[in-house]
């Protein structure tokens, strides 16, 4: 195979791989329609209460609002499991010495990294499927 043939083959592979990603569009088609939908799940309901000032949470010294959040979402603190994967918004903070703690119940996951002010949440919304949230404890 000559240099020109290899360049044409390479160019064909590159052009084919640059086709528009359609994965994002599927969230805007029925039945999901994310941008037109309003979440109705335990986290969105808790978010509404927080915005209205209906919750009086006192942060703890080392974990911030984690315990209050778990109690409000009815997640047992004993559900904790540790995860070392860096597939997180906080991947740069996660290490063998600082794993991400995951707390969960049947519908909700809460991710916490020691020393971070960000909590990651995922909930199974009945109408929208998996919905992801982040909770910045600095703003509370």
Kindly give the residue locations of the regions a language model identified:
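Bacterial N-terminal signal peptides that target proteins for export
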Residues: 1-10
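Sec/Tat signal peptide C-region and signal peptidase I cleavage site
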Residues: 19-23
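Generic low-polarity alpha-helical segments
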Residues: 1, 139-140
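Bacterial N-terminal signal peptides
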Residues: 9-17
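Extracytoplasmic c-type cytochrome modules immediately beyond a signal peptide or single-pass transmembrane anchor
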Residues: 24-138
């Amino acid at each position: 195979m000559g240099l020109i043939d290899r360049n044409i083959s390479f160019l064909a592979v590159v052009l084919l791989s640059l086709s528009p990603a359609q994965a994002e569009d599927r969230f805007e088609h029925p039945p999901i329609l994310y941008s037109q939908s309003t979440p109705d799940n335990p986290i969105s309901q808790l978010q509404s209460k927080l915005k209205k000032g209906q919750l009086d949470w006192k942060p703890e010294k080392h974990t911030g609002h984690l315990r209050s959040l778990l109690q409000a979402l009815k997640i047992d603190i004993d559900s904790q499991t540790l995860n070392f994967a860096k597939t997180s918004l906080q991947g740069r903070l996660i290490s063998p010495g600082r794993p991400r703690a995951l707390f969960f119940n049947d519908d909700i996951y809460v991710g916490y990294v020691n020393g971070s002010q960000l909590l990651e949440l995922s909930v199974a919304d009945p109408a929208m499927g998996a919905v992801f949230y982040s909770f910045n404890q600095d703003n509370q």
